[in-house]
Amino acid sequence: MDTSPLCFSILLVLCIFIQSSALGQSLKPEPFGRRAQAVETNKTLHEMKTRFLLFGETNQGCQIRINHPDTLQECGFNSSLPLVMIIHGWSVDGVLENWIWQMVAALKSQPAQPVNVGLVDWITLAHDHYTIAVRNTRLVGKEVAALLRWLEESVQLSRSHVHLIGYSLGAHVSGFAGSSIGGTHKIGRITGLDAAGPLFEGSAPSNRLSPDDANFVDAIHTFTREHMGLSVGIKQPIGHYDFYPNGGSFQPGCHFLELYRHIAQHGFNAITQTIKCSHERSVHLFIDSLLHAGTQSMAYPCGDMNSFSQGLCLSCKKGRCNTLGYHVRQEPRSKSKRLFLVTRAQSPFKVYHYQFKIQFINQTETPIQTTFTMSLLGTKEKMQKIPITLGKGIASNKTYSFLITLDVDIGELIMIKFKWENSAVWANVWDTVQTIIPWSTGPRHSGLVLKTIRVKAGETQQRMTFCSENTDDLLLRPTQEKIFVKCEIKSKTSKRKIR
């Protein structure tokens, strides 16, 4: 088991504990009303510290000032277009992170859907002890709400045409902007990118981002692995649709092997850089959805990642599925929906999901421990030797269900090659044992029979059944590869459904 993420999470939690203890604060969710009152008394100290930047033809931000309509003209604000505002999170070094400029460029690269692209720069309030930065989120949210009200009054920009994209603490800033804007109409959309967990997990909806804060709220959870009661990203659902890539706890390609060397060289500031991989993956998944609009990542409703890994949750009936990122289908719901998907370790992050159901008949008296590989041939591409491990071994007459993901679109699946990947030595032992020991009343080589392979493609929702090309020999032997082709099987269940 890889213990590096565990060690890192413990270090992060200890850092927050140390900060909180130094400030005499508790990490338990505290009613935000008391915090807000303390912040409001010092509001004049922070009056001008939040900046609102607009990005025109260049990626150099132009500052918009509330009650200064001339700045709108100077910055090239187009009131006929929607407004998308990016809100960053907690800062350790006081510097705006590189992903901001990547997202700005990605948003501006949508010629079919032009928008005003803005940034809420609250770096001076975010660059502080975490607990203090948390307290500042409500204040900054109110300032964002004030900006939106002013734009509505001065240039008639409808708040329903506003999309706030908040990362980490910025997600909760977005929520406070939505809850404090007032009036009968809500902000159009809020996207929470791995919304911060500490001091928000388990709190009331009014004290964090929640579905009530906008007409539509979507959230992407990428670093929710919990230790000592805390997780970097919030784990609980906070939107109308909550996406959990790879289960949401940790992300592929995020290696912690260099963590200890970095700490030795740079001190505990190295933790901040290491955390970015999984926490910031939410940002890059969202950017990826903008850059690869033609290949959106599909997500599927499921109870948990364990069920999803068995391929049990690929049904998209009645519009149950949705796409992750900018182009999500916006459907407000009365109850949050949790969706799961698998991604690659790098952009483009999209994979293709398949459920495989394999029916084995083990005619021996004990479970067979072994590994297999599958090679898939599609109308577009082929994939060779995908490893398959079936838990505790193959018991008698059982169907196994599991999820396979592919990095490429192979088209329609037309053939499967299934191989028992034991050594030739094991094959000789297998034959010898069967010669010595008679297996019940069956034929000499009875043992492991592979009857059918049923497949469901998540992205296309196509169902297929594959049978052995040689129907006279269904026995699978060590080192042997069998070819399976499409076939039609009418089961009793399907007959009942037809009726």
UniProtKB/Swiss-Prot annotation:
InterPro entries: AB_hydrolase_fold, Lipase, Lipase_hep, Lipase_LIPH, Lipase_N, PLAT/LH2_dom, PLAT/LH2_dom_sf, TAG_lipase. Its EC number is 3.1.1.3, 3.1.1.5, 3.1.1.32. SUPFAM superfamilies: alpha/beta-Hydrolases (SSF53474), Lipase/lipooxygenase domain (PLAT/LH2 domain) (SSF49723). It is an enzyme of class 3 (hydrolase). Residues 352-486 form the PLAT domain. Its main location: secreted. Pfam families: Lipase, PLAT. It is found in: Secreted. Keywords: Disease variant, Glycoprotein, HDL, Heparin-binding, Hydrolase, Lipid degradation, Lipid metabolism, Secreted, Signal. GO terms for cellular component: endoplasmic reticulum lumen; extracellular region; extracellular space; high-density lipoprotein particle. Changing residue 289 to F: In HL deficiency. One of its GO terms (biological process) is phosphatidylcholine catabolic process. Glycans are attached at residues 42, 78, 362, 397. It catalyses: a triacylglycerol + H2O = a diacylglycerol + a fatty acid + H(+); a 1-acyl-sn-glycero-3-phosphocholine + H2O = sn-glycerol 3-phosphocholine + a fatty acid + H(+); a 1,2-diacyl-sn-glycero-3-phosphocholine + H2O = a 2-acyl-sn-glycero-3-phosphocholine + a fatty acid + H(+); 1,2,3-tri-(9Z-octadecenoyl)-glycerol + H2O = di-(9Z)-octadecenoylglycerol + (9Z)-octadecenoate + H(+). GO terms for molecular function: apolipoprotein binding; heparin binding; lipoprotein lipase activity; low-density lipoprotein particle binding; lysophospholipase activity; phospholipase A1 activity; phospholipase activity; triacylglycerol lipase activity. Residues 1-22 form the signal peptide. Belongs to the AB hydrolase superfamily. Lipase family. Homodimer. It is linked to Hepatic lipase deficiency: A disorder characterized by elevated levels of beta-migrating very low density lipoproteins, and abnormally triglyceride-rich low and high density lipoproteins. Catalyzes the hydrolysis of triglycerides and phospholipids present in circulating plasma lipoproteins, including chylomicrons, intermediate density lipoproteins (IDL), low density lipoproteins (LDL) of large size and high density lipoproteins (HDL), releasing free fatty acids (FFA) and smaller lipoprotein particles. Also exhibits lysophospholipase activity. Can hydrolyze both neutral lipid and phospholipid substrates but shows a greater binding affinity for neutral lipid substrates than phospholipid substrates. This is Hepatic triacylglycerol lipase. It comes from Homo sapiens.
